[in-house]
């Protein structure tokens, strides 16, 4: 499948917004809704991890295809339908310019094209999508393949911000792009800070932190100085939650009144969690979320206590 053919489904993020939702119509709170968060389908990592060669391995991804198909089938069965399905980065394992990247991307797009057309896809860039140290070229490639690397959109009075967390990790090879991203983010947070929205929610690949704001720097979190600066910005703007992936395990914590939610992977697990998805229910007062294994969500659907939240006025 060519990128052009895939464009309709995957290029919904354009001009720093998502064309699936009208910002005019969606500015008003209309009552509770829910969405699905997934992370790290990362086609190719399971083989690379098993062979101990994460840099050069990953020449097979049949397992990940099956898991992604199971995730899509589970989402398509849900009733009522989620407002959207967000994938928080590391869509494929092969880094920019590496072997198998094109094939992994085509296979993932083939699976994602089967998501119910009434459930928009929200695609977040991860380090494997734009590179650990992104460049203008790797960012441009992501945009050609998947749409904008950062953008905002409104759903039912809630402002959602999709960030490119690689700019927060290492922007040494694209400082001008980071500056544009930071300026845009400050503008968006001003809107949130004016309380023009019911809630504000952030999606990014790399977590601010895994358990607590003061934890040591690690491959799987942002550095202390960056995470504190970002977390304070979010708190002051009234952001309720940050949803991320990257860790391939479930984790998270709170800082002041900010919920940092780290979801395990659809694909390769690096801990004891199961391949799964997170159901996120947004009500007038709060955001409630629960991680489901793919088997649980496929077989049983969403539990009654979460469904009851959707009936609140």
Curated annotation (Swiss-Prot):
Location of this chain's protein in the cell: Cytoplasm
Named cofactor requirement(s): a divalent metal cation
Lineage: Eukaryota, Metazoa, Chordata, Craniata, Vertebrata
Binding site for a divalent metal cation 1: 53, 90
SUPFAM superfamilies according to UniProt: Metallo-dependent phosphatases (SSF56300)
UniProt keyword terms in alphabetical order: Cytoplasm, Hydrolase, Metal-binding, Phosphoprotein
Disulphide bridges: none
Main location: cytoplasm
Stated name of the protein: Serine/threonine-protein phosphatase CPPED1
Family to which the UniProt record says this protein belongs: Belongs to the metallophosphoesterase superfamily. CPPED1 family.
Phosphoserine found at: 2, 293
Function summary: Protein phosphatase that dephosphorylates AKT family kinase specifically at 'Ser-473', blocking cell cycle progression and promoting cell apoptosis. May play an inhibitory role in glucose uptake by adipocytes.
GO MF, one annotated term: metal ion binding
This protein's GO CC annotations: cytoplasm
């Amino acid at each position: 499948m060519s990128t052009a053919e895939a464009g309709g489904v995957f290029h919904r993020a354009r001009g720093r917004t998502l064309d699936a939702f009208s910002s005019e119509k969606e500015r008003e709170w209309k009552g509770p809704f829910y969405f699905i968060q997934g992370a790290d389908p990362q086609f190719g990592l399971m083989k690379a991890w098993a062979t101990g060669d994460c840099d050069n391995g990953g020449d097979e991804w049949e397992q990940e295809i099956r898991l992604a198909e199971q995730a899509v089938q589970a989402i398509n069965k849900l009733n009522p339908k989620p407002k959207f399905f967000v994938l928080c980065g590391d869509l494929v394992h092969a880094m920019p310019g590496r072997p198998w990247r094109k094939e992994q991307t085509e296979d993932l797009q083939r699976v994602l094209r089967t998501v119910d057309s009434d459930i928009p896809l929200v695609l977040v860039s991860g380090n494997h999508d734009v590179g650990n140290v992104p460049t203008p070229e790797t960012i441009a490639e992501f945009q050609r393949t998947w749409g904008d690397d950062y953008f905002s959109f409104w759903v039912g009075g809630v402002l959602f911000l999709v960030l490119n967390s690689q700019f927060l990790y290492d922007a040494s090879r694209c400082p001008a792009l980071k500056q544009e991203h930071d300026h845009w983010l400050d503008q968006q947070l001003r809107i949130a800070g004016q309380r023009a929205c019911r809630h504000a929610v952030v999606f990014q690949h790399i977590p601010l932190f895994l358990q607590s704001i003061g934890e040591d720097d690690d491959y799987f979190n942002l550095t202390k100085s960056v995470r504190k600066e970002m977390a304070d910005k979010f708190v002051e703007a009234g952001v309720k939650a940050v949803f991320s992936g990257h860790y391939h395990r479930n984790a998270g914590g709170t800082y002041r009144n900010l919920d940092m939610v780290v979801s395990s992977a659809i694909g390769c697990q690096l801990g004891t969690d199961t391949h799964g998805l997170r159901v996120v229910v947004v009500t007038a007062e709060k955001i409630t979320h629960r991680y489901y294994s793919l088997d649980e969500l496929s077989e049983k659907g969403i539990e009654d206590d979460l469904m009851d939240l959707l009936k609140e006025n």
